[in-house]
């Protein structure tokens, strides 16, 4: 009898434990007998640590799952309503709060209604809850992101790009799973619960990630989803079209996505001024006056996805991708010596390129006991590259210079990664991981000069990172060990590194915080720069690889302050970066008096960047203004050169939305970059957009540079022996009109998506380019 009681008690305890690990909290928010749609619901601990959050659906309902036993506060707020806090003491089993009443209220600030999105500053991320108006007026996930105005994030709807003011890439995710921009373009705004913005990503996200934007969307269980996003110009061959299908069956999800991009213009040309200086003191300047020519590019991207989830315990995801890109460029110019303008030569350059990149991505995530998790990811990629270039200089049909080059490249790569995470205490977490990457590049160069290269590259890293919070102070300490190896015939390198990372933050209040971030990282030379290859550029210049390039060290420090006051918010950011022995360009004269452009490990490179960002709005739930400005100061030291450069830049944007209409106007000037001896001029452009949303259909228009008729980009080279300046013109980039249509339909989707937390990809072909 006692034995039976013990067994029954044990089973009961086990059931209680299992049940407690899946505690649910749900309810319905109502005001004056009407459901409150898009009300913000946040679950947090008694000391204000964020646990879960989101917004209510169209019927005022919300549900939070997988909550651990404990005592919490449930905070409910909504635009135009009084906030309400519900204490959930000793929560151990699922709880249905039923109908939760909140009262209407208007909060005025100088006769302007405060309707900004709720922002929660967590230790390692910002959690942003979209407002009801933002969810209703946005046409897709990208326009919603633009309306939410994340600090230091720029959204370009014309080019479908998301970038950061900081250096590095922006990772896009949905429920933690790596997402392409095509997924965001067909995401319904009403499916977005919140956005988690990692503006200081940890070691698990990689060394060169500027920010991570994670869309937390509603979980579904059954049904399917079909979406289309088309963006095309009626007068220029310019388009970006996306199509996605997802179908769910029990614990499985099947997905297909297709993207087509095309560009073709007939009024593209370039102007160059190049000076060549010889050892005897003589020199001359050659001028290239471009003639409008044709340039085109198009690409296809297809992805097949299958995922399987077992009740939140483990998750498997497999993705097969194929990307194909092809480009063609024709340049015609007149060439002459500045001192002898009557002696004109005709220059013709024709180049084509094709890249095919299939890949397989396998991902596994498992939740373990005691707040532990394990992630394993493996990605294999093959890149096939084919390109050719012809270049002639001469009079009529008599070429004086005739250059032809071809490149056939094959690159194979494998990336494997494992991550282990554990919650040590209620306010601290431990993360550790290993990553292994191996690449093999086999390239054949033909034409006037022929060669073959076989390059092997290996990178292995292991890291551990500990993060926590003490009252208003939060911290993170990380240490990464790495091994890098490169081999090409008898040349190569082996390098071991130990790299620390530190993040310290202090939150003065819910609306003001300050943060410091310091890190040391390594940058490896690209395979395309390390090949022992020479490619002729023109009659005077040669591009050469350098197999003696070595890994270099990057030191980076950032100090940031963020503040909010009613309708006003701002961000002050100061960053300093120092690179020791960076890989930068140099130009030398060889024994044949040819000017060889190559790369080498130079002395140092420094960048100082203060930036200020201010936001105002939304005013009366209609207008939002934002303005950012900063200064880039560069100090570039080579083995035989030293350059400094200062650039002031700005970006301004105004957004308006009223009922089903929304519009925006944004502009920015040149944000220039100086590296080595090259000054690269950033784009100076402005964009105007207007859209109308009706249920699942969104139609609109955008125009690029409607108020100017001269679009150009360019740069300068400050070499002692071969300085140059160039401008690239594209007439079609002025007054470019684009029509946009988004449509989606879902049927019975109730699928719960787990989080894929790593993103590995290889897109570097590893071939040396021969053009200017």
Regions found by a protein language model. Give the residues of each.
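Short, acidic, small-residue-rich periplasmic hinge/interaction motif at the N-terminus
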Residues: 40-44, 77-79, 95-134, 143, ...
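Short, acidic Ser/Thr/Gly-rich low-complexity loop/linker segments typical of extracellular
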Residues: 46-61
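N-terminal periplasmic accessory domains that precede
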Residues: 96-101, 111, 141-144, 160-162, ...
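Extracytoplasmic beta-strand/coil segments of soluble accessory domains associated
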Residues: 142-177
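Short acidic/polar hinge/loop motifs at secondary-structure boundaries
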Residues: 175-202, 304
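Face-selective signature of the C-terminal outer-membrane beta-barrel domain
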Residues: 299-327, 350-500, 507, 511, ...
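Outer membrane beta-barrel strand-and-loop segments of large Gram-negative receptors
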Residues: 413-415, 455, 461, 546, ...
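Surface-exposed extracellular loop regions of Gram-negative outer-membrane beta-barrel proteins
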Residues: 485, 510-557, 574-592, 707-722
